[in-house]
Amino acid sequence: MASWGGEKRGGAEGSPKLAVYATRKTRSVRSQEDQWYLGYPGDQWSSGFSYSWWKNSVGSESKHGEGALDQPQHDVRLEDLGELHRAARSGDVPGVEHVLAPGDTGVDKRDRKKSIQQLVPEYKEKQTPESLPQNNNPDWHPTNLTLSDETCQRSKNLKVGDKSPSVSPSMPENQSATKELGQMNLTEREKMDTGVVLLSGNDTLHDLCQSQLPENKESKEAEQDLELTSEEEQERLKGCENKQPQKTSQEPEMAKDCDREDIPIYPVLPHVQKSEEMWIEQGKLEWKNQLKLVINELKQRFGEIYEKYKIPACPEEEPLLDNSTRGTDVKDIPFNLTNNIPGCEEEDASEISVSVVFETFPEQKEPSLKNIIHPYYHPYSGSQEHVCQSSSKLHLHENKLDCDNDNKLGIGHIFSTDNNFHNDASTKKARNPEVVTVEMKEDQEFDLQMTKNMNQNSDSGSTNNYKSLKPKLENLSSLPPDSDRTSEVYLHEELQQDMQKFKNEVNTLEEEFLALKKENVQLHKEVEEEMEKHRSNSTELSGTLTDGTTVGNDDDGLNQQIPRKENEEHDRPADKTANEKNKVKNQIYPEADFADSMEPSEIASEDCELSHSVYENFMLLIEQLRMEYKDSASLPRIQDTFCLCEHLLKLKNNHCDQLTVKLKQMENMVSVLQNELSETKKTKLQLELQKIEWEKELYDLRLALKQENGRKEMPICCIIKIVNS
């Protein structure tokens, strides 16, 4: 058995100090856990009790389960153990009582006070060898634990947790027992019981107990320091008694509980401070709730007025270039809006007109909101409101000019681009066909590159511009109210520049969209024309082939009519026929390759010429083959010509497929641009809604500020009237 702490401080008559006794429980109670017990080394009963219990627990595994630890005890958390030690050392009886039994209504106050005094060394009664329980009553011995089981029926059951300490002071049931033959009654015997502090834990708790239970010298010095600090606290708090009358009202109640033992009570305790802090926090919460109620009432009143006059919130869908017509709507706003609102003056009328004018310009997102927010940060400064009004008027004048200029520039730019487009088309039609084919190739490559860059830049540019707008709008609301007017003007100019860039990008996207639509229409027309040409060529070829077959059947008649030509053709060498065949191939293939490489806008004329030339060559070959029907190479020649025609048709079909692919690409581009336009419209609507919400909040806050100022001015006016009267 190990113990920490000193012997009796003042000999036999001094108050004992707390000590910790270590035991190890067997498997039947806990699986070999170290347990620590708190007691007084001067109290022989407590030391003998812990030692005998430890011996019995080591000796037998059946008896310790029904020992003193099975008595009802109080639960104490590990976090409150340090507070209990400090309260016991400093003599803070209410603090110990608060830790041991914070809500125990079943224990009598007097019994609880007597049990707590055992833990407080300053107030424990001086013991003599005659008053010890083992000298007066031999039955009262640690081995006879049945008495404690009988007398401790009123206290609570001890539930030992794995990591939670507990204190078990014994509570007497019979308080009216009398002293006979020098024996003490149960209450005075149990005054000697200092309790058992059960610490289930580890070596950290052992170190904690050593640090909180020093030896004699260290404990004496600590007690002296505590007395000095308690005296200083008394002097400090005597000066605060006039300011805090609630603390003095709590002291007599504490004195009533402890009037029989004449225990001095300290004026300030931790739980008193906590209660005061809770009271202050409750006051703050009530104040905040009142403010919220006032703001809600103001919002409701503003909503009623808003519904009554129906201020236009935001248009659903409007054209992009109609800002010049929006300025006229400001005159139609009813001026009775400010007269019907209670507490509003002429300044409110100007402020409302300013906010409504901002609603008529949705492109201007946030220039004057920052200036309007300043009165919210400085509710008691009157100059800020005038600055806000003047700056908002300035912004309005500038934004009107900017919107007019933007509209003029945008319309002029669109007309100029349309004119240029038509002029370019007319000049291209007037050029030579050869020059047109070369330039169309270059234009096609340039258009492909431009479309790729457009796909990349349009997606990234619009999103990046919107993302770049967001932090600036947020920074406007988060700027400090003490910023100079120069910084405000600078931010306003930056925001206008960003908005102008955004407008320009939207205009360019619209122009590109229109150009793509026109190109799409042209491509559709060209594809239809080419399909018609293919159909006509196929019908002509089928007709010529049928003529050739009929001619092949009537070869005998031709031989009778033209015998000389037959002989001449028969006498021709095979080389000559081969050369003619190669010439025909050279005539057909280069034109086919040329047709494959040409642009769709010039294919129509070239295809007509090509089909006509191929048809003539084909007819010449058929005539030659008619003359050379006896030649063995006549049949392969016909097959070769037929294959050439099929190859030509395949090339044209491939060209049609390429055109369809281009059409699909253009349609995809159009859909992408439409999505981007819809997204930009959505962002505009969202920004307008945010702007309107912020203006509503500003209006509510201004009303609240004016009402508060009116409430503050009312008592001043009353005082002035009283003084004047």
UniProtKB/Swiss-Prot annotation:
Keyword line: Coiled coil
Basic and acidic residues bias: start-end ranges: 1-11, 528-537, 563-583
Coiled coil: 215-244, 490-546, 648-713
Segments for region (Disordered): 1-25, 87-188, 213-260, 453-485, 528-586
Keyword Coiled coil: yes
Positions with biased composition (Acidic residues): 224-234
Feature: compositional bias, Low complexity: 543-552
Polar residues: compositionally biased ranges: 129-150, 165-178, 453-467
Keyword S-adenosyl-L-methionine: no
Signal sequence annotation: none
InterPro entries: C144A/B/C
Similarity comment: Belongs to the CCDC144 family.
Protein's UniProt name: Putative coiled-coil domain-containing protein 144B
Gene name of this polypeptide: CCDC144BP
